[in-house]
Amino acid sequence: MDNHNEVPMSMSAPWASAARVTCLSLDAKCHRPCPSSISASASASGCASDSAAIATTKLRHIAYTQRCSSRLTMLMTVLLLLLPLSFTPAHSCGPGRGLGRRRERNLYPLVLKQTIPNLSEYQSGASGPLEGEIKRDSPKFKDLVPNYNRDILFRDEEGTGADRLMTKRCKEKLNVLAYSVMNEWPGVRLLVTESWDEDHQHGQESLHYEGRAVTIATSDREPSRYGMLARLAVEAGFDWVSYVSRRHIYCSVKSDSSISSHVHGCFTPESTALLESGITKPLSEIAIGDRVLSMGSNGQPVYSEVILFMDRNLEQMQNFVELHTDGGAVLTVTPAHLISVWHPERQQLDYVFADRVEELNYVLVRDPQTGELRPQRVVRVGSVRSKGVVAPLTREGTIVVNSVAASCYAVIDSQSLAHWGLAPMRILAMLQSWMPAKDQLRSSQTEGVVSRAEQQNGIHWYANALYKVKDYVLPKSWRHD
């Protein structure tokens, strides 16, 4: 939609030719007599009636052209509104029989005593270190949430409801697992025999005391199902799963405080973007309606409108990944954010999570002399903790930040799927642009006008909704967990 504002770039660039371009051209031609020829004929005859006929013909031609334009606009509007209805997201990524088609890959059950990942439970690659026991009088007790999912059976031997208490992340993964269990074995429900423990019935170092672990089984107590139950727990997103015995499965998760960088993808507020006017602005000052430098689907630089902020919080402390290139560019971004990576050996452009970009990989960086995107080698990958997060969304779904081309999306390992998921917001922005009050909702250089970007604080409701449902419709291999 923004391709008519492309910045000049050599079409011979390999990443431009490697990018897929889908074009839809509509050619409407009106076969009408040329008014100029009619006018010349009328002038030659000198007939007044012919002049009147010529004027009438011109008016009819103008009216016809306006009707053609109006009908074409109406047709395009209908097509844009109906296009999302022709897709069914569950068909491409449903994890179970209840959503879309069946899994294309086979899931193998765990064997007795097997753990996934094959690490210590307390390593950062698993559930992470202990943070301390939570008691009823502890300040952190308010962070535990009860789980009243009707698809889950809680044994609750103590009769205090303690087995229903857990961290938010544990509750989220447990609900996903309960859904998978019902899909895998109709009529069977998930059974939780232990969650948060306040009676010290486990070892001294147990995540049960923090509400980060659950002991589970199936409602029919059929041991032959437990290997697959463990596998389903892995797919549900538990950070550490152990087929600990023939009677139950043990699962645990990272602490809620340690996974904040995984729930969204953002840049630092002081990172900059280039506006169409030629001005470079910090992302903290970018507003809805600004047109910033992005990368089109054909790999070329293009200016695209900011339609919303998926996250914006200038006070939140966050962990970031720093990517340094041999040309001096530095991109600071959250670990789950998608970055465009160029593979010269395959002549292919991919999107990779920021924390999976390695040294010697190539990223696309804007050349200040030509304005073109050129590959630069990553020479160092570091980490930093900084204050503030900003995540603008453009119509293109990409943005050039600190001269480095990046996606606007995160968490989901597919640029195209993430872009499709935000299609309703692009359509909504298009409809809002047709409203008379459009200018009141956009940024303005006039004093006293406060942009919507300055009013937003936190995750956008639609982005938050997508994050909550992703575990139900996407396999774990597609997610940044």
Curated annotation (Swiss-Prot):
A lipid is attached at residue 265 (Cholesterol glycine ester). Its EC number is 3.1.-.-. Pfam families: HH_signal, Hint. Ca(2+) 1 binds at residues 157-158, 163, 193-194. GO terms for biological process: anatomical structure morphogenesis; cell fate specification; cell-cell signaling; intein-mediated protein splicing; protein autoprocessing; regulation of gene expression; segment polarity determination; self proteolysis. A lipid is attached at residue 93 (N-palmitoyl cysteine). One of its GO terms (molecular function) is peptidase activity. Keywords: Autocatalytic cleavage, Calcium, Cell membrane, Cytoplasm, Developmental protein, Hydrolase, Lipoprotein, Membrane, Metal-binding, Morphogen, Nucleus, Palmitate, Protease, Segmentation polarity protein, Signal, Transferase. SUPFAM superfamilies: Hedgehog/DD-peptidase (SSF55166), Hedgehog/intein (Hint) domain (SSF51294). Its main location: nucleus. The record marks 265-266 as: Cleavage. One of its GO terms (cellular component) is cytoplasm. Interacts with shf. PANTHER family: HEDGEHOG (PTHR11889), PROTEIN HEDGEHOG (PTHR11889:SF31). Belongs to the hedgehog family. This is Protein hedgehog. The lineage of its organism: Eukaryota, Metazoa, Ecdysozoa, Arthropoda, Hexapoda. The gene is hh.
